[in-house]
């Protein structure tokens, strides 16, 4: 008998487990909490200093005055560190039973066996499971949780950590820098190309929880890697905060693809800083799927520093009742003959709000640079809204910039055509939406495309009538 595929759609039901943590910090953000986190991790002195300086920056920096409403986000109500187990296990059988049951529901063991070169699973503040194929280690590839990389690869770690996203970048980058825990660290040596993805899962289980993973990826000259992350959390009446930082360095002739499929519950603030430095003839691809959350503010950024560097963002955002998806991309052209592409697909229903917010910058040295932007929004009812807010900065006259934006509704003609062939209105609307997101799903590995379609179908429930 065929085994049932892991159903990421189960996230929709917001299951959560009993608290199995072995340590939980007090609520609120203080210097003592920051010191406690660093002490529990047995970190070097320079990292504690970095955290404390970041905390001071966080206190000084203002809240963003644009994007979604953050007035209900209470930093004193959040638990900043929860340790779910003693250590990250390399055998699935050794993961604590309660935690293992959660990830079993999400299909992680089966996904690892079938599709992946390496897997990391983070539960609350810490990675609880981590494994990588032995042959990849033999090639010199490093794939660890970020805390382990700090301890075991300190020189390499220190060279790149906070070099792309400094603590002073924005208030939530400063917050992450003060209390970061977990995340993935990847180093791919020169000319090594991974054919199968590395993957991480991030799960918030507790109420009023803050998750602050820090991911750092370095693709050395001529290297290639695809990293996939999935994110989920159960439904609570009070708010949780996910505030990650992702830093990526794409060296000469290297290629990185970073795929995100998030399905946070609608009580989660998802406030993330993602940025990459791309050097000569390097290629960075962001593939970004944003479902769920109360508010998402996320703008994957490519800084194109070397001649011929390429950057692209392909994103989809789905906003339902009570949700705001404020997402987009930033492309910063700093070198000649660089190129960038932004394709943004947004869907809103039941009063949801989607906002595309993007920046394309052409510096004085970016002669011959070019950028293409496409923003398409599908609005499913009269209560939902969409805004497109592009911002372009041009400091030389030898560039090419194209921008196309389109807002549409499901047309009566489309529905009539499909319904005249015996298809119900609900099924017809679903088919139109699936066609709309197809440019996104076709870029996903097959198993993720299937799950993305399932998630969209769950989101589409009750969209008719």
Swiss-Prot record:
Q: Which SUPFAM superfamilies has this protein been placed in?
A: Stabilizer of iron transporter SufD
- What GO biological process terms does the UniProt entry carry, in alphabetical order? iron-sulfur cluster assembly
Source superkingdom:
Bacteria
Q: Which Pfam families match?
A: SUFBD_core (PF01458), SufBD_N (PF19295)
Give the matching NCBIfam families.
Answer: sufB (TIGR01980)
Output the PANTHER family linked to this UniProt entry: FES CLUSTER ASSEMBLY PROTEIN SUF, UPF0051 PROTEIN ABCI8, CHLOROPLASTIC-RELATED
Protein name from the UniProt record: Iron-sulfur cluster assembly SufBD family protein SAB0778
Organism field:
Staphylococcus aureus (strain bovine RF122 / ET3-1)
Q: What is the lineage of its organism?
A: Bacteria, Bacillati, Bacillota, Bacilli, Bacillales
């Amino acid at each position: 008998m065929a085994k049932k595929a892991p159903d990421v759609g189960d996230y929709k039901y917001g299951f959560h487990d009993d608290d199995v943590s072995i340590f939980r910090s007090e609520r609120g953000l203080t210097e003592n909490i920051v010191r406690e986190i660093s002490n529990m991790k047995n970190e070097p002195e320079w990292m504690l200093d970095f955290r404390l300086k970041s905390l001071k920056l966080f206190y000084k920096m203002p809240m963003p005055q644009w994007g979604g409403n953050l007035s209900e986000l209470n930093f004193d109500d959040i638990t900043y560190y929860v340790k779910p187990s003693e250590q990250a296990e390399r055998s699935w059988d050794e993961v604590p039973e309660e935690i293992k049951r959660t990830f079993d529901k999400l299909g992680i063991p089966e996904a690892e066996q079938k599709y992946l070169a390496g897997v990391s699973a983070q539960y609350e503040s810490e990675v609880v499971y981590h494994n990588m194929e032995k042959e990849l280690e033999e090639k010199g590839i490093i794939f660890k949780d970020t805390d382990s990389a700090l301890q075991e690869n300190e020189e390499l770690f220190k060279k790149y950590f906070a070099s792309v996203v400094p603590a002073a970048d924005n208030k939530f980058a400063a917050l992450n820098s003060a209390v970061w825990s977990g995340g993935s660290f990847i180093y791919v040596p020169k000319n090594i190309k991974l054919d199968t993805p590395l993957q991480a899962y991030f799960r918030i289980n507790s109420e009023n929880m803050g998750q602050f993973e820090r991911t750092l990826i370095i693709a050395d000259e001529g290297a290639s890697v695809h990293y996939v992350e999935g994110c989920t959390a159960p439904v609570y009446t009070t708010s949780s905060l996910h505030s990650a930082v992702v830093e990526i360095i794409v060296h000469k002739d290297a290629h990185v693809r970073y795929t995100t499929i998030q399905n946070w519950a609608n009580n989660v603030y998802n406030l993330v800083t993602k940025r990459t430095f791309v050097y000569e003839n390097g290629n960075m691809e962001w593939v970004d799927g944003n479902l769920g959350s109360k508010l998402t503010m996320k703008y994957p950024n490519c800084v194109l520093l070397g001649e011929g560097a390429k950057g692209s963002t392909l994103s989809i955002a789905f906003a339902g009742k009570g949700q705001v998806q404020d997402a987009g991309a930033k492309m910063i052209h700093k070198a000649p003959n660089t190129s960038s592409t932004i394709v943004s697909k947004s869907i809103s229903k039941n009063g949801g709000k989607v906002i595309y917010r993007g920046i394309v910058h052409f510096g004085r040295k970016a002669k011959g640079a070019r950028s293409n932007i496409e923003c398409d929004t599908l609005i499913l009812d009269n209560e939902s809204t969409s805004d497109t807010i592009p911002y372009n900065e041009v400091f030389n006259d030898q560039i090419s910039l194209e921008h196309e934006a389109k807002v549409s509704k499901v047309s009566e003609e489309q529905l009539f055509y499909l319904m005249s062939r015996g298809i119900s209105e609900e099924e017809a609307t679903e088919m139109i939406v699936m066609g709309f997101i197809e440019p996104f799903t076709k870029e996903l590995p097959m198993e993720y495309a299937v799950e993305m379609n399932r998630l969209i179908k769950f989101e589409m429930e009750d969209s008719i009538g």
